[in-house]
Amino acid sequence: MTVPMATDNKLSFATRAIHAGYNSADNEGSLNPPIYMTSTYAFESVEQGAGRFSGEQQGHFYSRISNPTQEILETRLADLEEGEAALATASGMGAITATLWTLLAPGDQVLVDKTLYGCTFSFMEHGLKKFGIEICYADFTDHSEMAAGLSDKTKVVYFETPVNPNMRLIDIAAISSLVKAYSPNIKVIVDNTYCTPVLQRPLTLGADLVVHSATKYLGGHGDLIAGAVVGDAETIQQIRLFGLKDMTGAVISPMTVFLILRGIKTLPLRMERHCHNAQLMAEMLEQHPAVDRVFFPGLKSDPWHDLACRQMDDFGGMIALELKGGYEAGVRMLNRLRLIKLAVSLGDAETLIQHPASMTHSVYTLEERKRHGISEGLVRISAGLEAVTDIIADLEQAMAD
């Protein structure tokens, strides 16, 4: 894996993951950021308070809007994603909903890829539609089909890449170019949870905003729930003051912020191991007689391999597969695992496995899953940090006759 290195006097990614946004000299020499457990902030005068509320003066005034610990994380995330600003939230869905409530109004359209994380799909299909917002689905790997979905009502184009759970890849630069040629006012939003900025930086490829479930790789240890959105400073401020403050209240805890900051320090190292383990696991699974198909962009046989080589710095830690025998074979394999944990989520130190149709994507009906490309027998694996020989041995014994 190639972690972005220093260029033009800018520190390398791994260094910025540890230092960006924080100066110990400003905090009594504390090597780690302080955790500001406060809901409100004292003003020196009425005039100062009024200035902060109006936005004419910089500074914190209520922790539903901002917090000093949170500000460090937001500065670091913006730096790593190469955006102007960031907003941290209480969950990934908090980031997504706060963003879309800010950008959309009744009568607007969102053009989305046909396959989405289950809760994102549910919010689009069962949330936004209730408020007069049109949701249009298209296969974003077919650029003609995607372009045909654009209209004068389109305000947002939204997709994940790699796609959860079936590991399709979408060309960020190509989609962004098509959208901006149609209208520069349409916001292109990319969920970068699977890759993190270590592997992929959508803003540099033409996207306007990036969203994350920080619960996953950014935190990295399965002990927190959080989210983030990164983009231009003006839009992020609008999301902060409306989508977060007024619409969702999805406020992140300072303690959670501290844990994410700690996690990000080791993010480049962890992603290297996740990628290494996933590559070897996918190569084994591709050759296994019990496996019908493996979906992993690091395999040369994968239809998205060439795009991954152009768009990503490595192939990630997520694998999807279908076993011969379909759903029943998948259930048998999952129930026989000893080391690998049967659990939703991803990006933890532990290797996790789950069945999307009955778990993370069960909010789709059977017909919706068929239409959106999620098979009943699909199994999703998040490669952990264990010795890959132990992970592979567990998979092999679980698939044995």
What positions do the PLM features span?
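N-terminal glycine-rich, Lys/His-bearing helix-loop that initiates the first secondary-structure elements
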Residues: 1-57
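PLP-dependent enzyme catalytic core of the Aspartate aminotransferase-like
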Residues: 2-3, 125, 134-136, 155, ...
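Conserved PLP-enzyme active-site core in the AAT-like
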Residues: 6-9, 17-26, 85-290, 295
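Glycine-rich beta-alpha junction loops
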Residues: 22-24, 37-43, 194-196, 216, ...
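Conserved N-terminal alpha-helix of the aminotransferase class I/II PLP-enzyme fold
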Residues: 45-94, 124-126
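Short amphipathic alpha-helical segments
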Residues: 58, 84, 225, 256, ...
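Acidic-histidine catalytic/liganding microenvironments
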Residues: 80, 285-289, 337
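Conserved C-terminal alpha-helix-loop-beta "cap" of PLP-dependent enzymes
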Residues: 293-379, 383
